[in-house]
């Protein structure tokens, strides 16, 4: 813009621009500097990404520390003696007024694991004084490996209909079976359509059927036991106790010695070859992989999940205390 005053009064400060005698940088040099700046920005981005990733992993680990059992359990505390729990208070007869049989010397727990396939353990399992099975794990077609004898069958609320829809398999095939059903009160005893009523109606059709439900007070004891053993509240940690948890405690209550077939150790999935696939259930060959199931449930924070690996760590700590042995695979 032209100066409106006399020329001598005008400011002759040069406009912003390159200093006198300096020319713009050559194009090649400018490109090198732009490339260097881009590389610096990329390096900063990589560093920030790494830091954020570390923070996320640390946060996830902290949130999931509920399942790092080894660092949580108080080593000096006195363990709960499960054999002193009152059986008469813990199990309510659904059919009739019987009392749950109170004692077996030698018990076996036959898990639903595919590790049992091909073992030919059927005759050995048949010789046990008491045999305990879970949910709707069948024996028909698998008896060579898992036997037929079923003294107790522990059934989750979610498996009630699976069991009752196949009475020829689960009721008539082994009429000596004692059923123990477990579930939250809103599932087992809600006013409309309770599962207890469903089981009672089944008892009218099969009068020899013997069934019990775990009492509300005993359900609280199971929750308290989880907190005592892991240091974490079950509900606050978004955990569901598995049927295996209930079965193991019931076995310890009822039996002097317990032999568990097919349960893998807690570190199994961290040691197993990644390409080896094992179905979660022996009767579902195309079902989910066992380690995928264990790890997803163990590490999930959204919703409620079974903490299978944590439970196995607890069982390992009970082995010597309660005379529990594990085989196929063998571990302690």
UniProtKB/Swiss-Prot annotation:
One of its GO terms (biological process) is ganglioside biosynthetic process. The chain crosses the membrane at residues 43-63. Residues 1-26 are annotated as: Disordered. It is found in: Golgi apparatus membrane. GO terms for molecular function: alpha-N-acetylgalactosaminide alpha-2,6-sialyltransferase activity. CDD domains: GT29_ST6GALNAC6 (cd23978). It is an enzyme of class 2 (transferase). GO terms for cellular component: Golgi membrane. Its EC number is 2.4.99.-. Keywords: Disulfide bond, Glycoprotein, Glycosyltransferase, Golgi apparatus, Lipid metabolism, Membrane, Sialic acid, Signal-anchor, Transferase, Transmembrane, Transmembrane helix. Residues 1-42 are cytoplasmic. Residues 64-332 are lumenal. Glycans are attached at residue 97. It catalyses: a ganglioside GM1b (d18:1(4E)) + CMP-N-acetyl-beta-neuraminate = a ganglioside GD1alpha (d18:1(4E)) + CMP + H(+); N-acetyl-alpha-neuraminosyl-(2->3)-beta-D-galactosyl-(1->3)-N-acetyl-beta-D-glucosaminyl-(1->3)-beta-D-galactosyl-(1->4)-beta-D-glucosyl-(1<->1')-N-acyl-sphing-4-enine + CMP-N-acetyl-beta-neuraminate = N-acetyl-alpha-neuraminosyl-(2->3)-beta-D-galactosyl-(1->3)-[N-acetyl-alpha-neuraminosyl-(2->6)]-N-acetyl-beta-D-glucosaminyl-(1->3)-beta-D-galactosyl-(1->4)-beta-D-glucosyl-(1<->1')-N-acyl-sphing-4-enine + CMP + H(+); a globoside MSGG + CMP-N-acetyl-beta-neuraminate = a globoside DSGG + CMP + H(+); a ganglioside GD1a (d18:1(4E)) + CMP-N-acetyl-beta-neuraminate = a ganglioside GT1aalpha (d18:1(4E)) + CMP + H(+). InterPro entries: Glyco_trans_29, GT29-like_sf. Transfers the sialyl group (N-acetyl-alpha-neuraminyl or NeuAc) from CMP-NeuAc onto glycoproteins and glycolipids, forming an alpha-2,6-linkage. Produces branched type disialyl structures by transfer of a sialyl group onto the GalNAc or GlcNAc residue inside backbone core chains having a terminal sialic acid with an alpha-2,3-linkage on Gal. ST6GalNAcVI prefers glycolipids to glycoproteins, predominantly catalyzing the biosynthesis of ganglioside GD1alpha from GM1b. Belongs to the glycosyltransferase 29 family. This is Alpha-N-acetylgalactosaminide alpha-2,6-sialyltransferase 6. The lineage of its organism: Eukaryota, Metazoa, Chordata, Craniata, Vertebrata.
């Amino acid at each position: 813009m032209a100066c409106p005053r006399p020329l001598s009064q005008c400011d002759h400060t040069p406009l912003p621009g390159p200093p006198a005698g300096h020319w713009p940088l050559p194009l090649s040099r400018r490109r090198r500097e732009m490339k260097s700046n881009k590389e610096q920005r990329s390096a900063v981005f990589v560093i920030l990404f790494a830091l954020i990733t570390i923070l996320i992993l640390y946060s996830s680990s902290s949130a999931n520390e509920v399942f790092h059992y080894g660092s949580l359990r108080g080593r000096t505390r006195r363990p709960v003696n499960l054999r002193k729990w009152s059986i008469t208070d813990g199990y309510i007869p659904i059919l009739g007024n019987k009392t749950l049989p109170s004692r077996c010397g030698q018990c076996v727990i036959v898990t639903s694991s595919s590790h049992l396939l091909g073992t030919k353990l059927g005759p050995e399992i048949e010789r046990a004084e008491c045999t305990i099975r879970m949910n709707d794990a069948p024996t028909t077609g698998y008896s060579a490996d898992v036997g037929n004898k079923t003294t107790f069958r522990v059934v989750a609320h979610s498996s009630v209909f699976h069991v009752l829809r196949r009475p020829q398999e689960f009721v008539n095939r082994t009429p000596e079976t004692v059923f123990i059903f477990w579930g939250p009160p809103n599932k087992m005893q809600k006013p409309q359509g309770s599962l207890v009523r469903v089981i009672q109606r089944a008892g009218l059709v099969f009068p020899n059927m013997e069934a019990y439900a775990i009492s509300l007070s005993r359900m609280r004891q199971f929750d308290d036991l989880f907190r005592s053993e892991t240091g974490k509240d079950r509900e606050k940690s978004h955990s569901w106790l598995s049927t295996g948890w209930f079965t193991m405690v019931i076995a310890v209550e009822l039996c002097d010695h317990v032999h568990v077939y097919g349960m893998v150790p807690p570190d199994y999935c961290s040691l197993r070859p990644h390409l080896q696939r094992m179905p979660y259930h022996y009767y579902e060959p195309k079902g989910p992989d066992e380690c995928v199931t264990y790890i997803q449930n163990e590490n999930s924070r959204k919703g409620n999940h079974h903490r299978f690996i944590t439970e196995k760590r607890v069982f390992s700590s009970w082995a010597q205390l309660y005379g529990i042995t594990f085989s196929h695979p063998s571990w302690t």
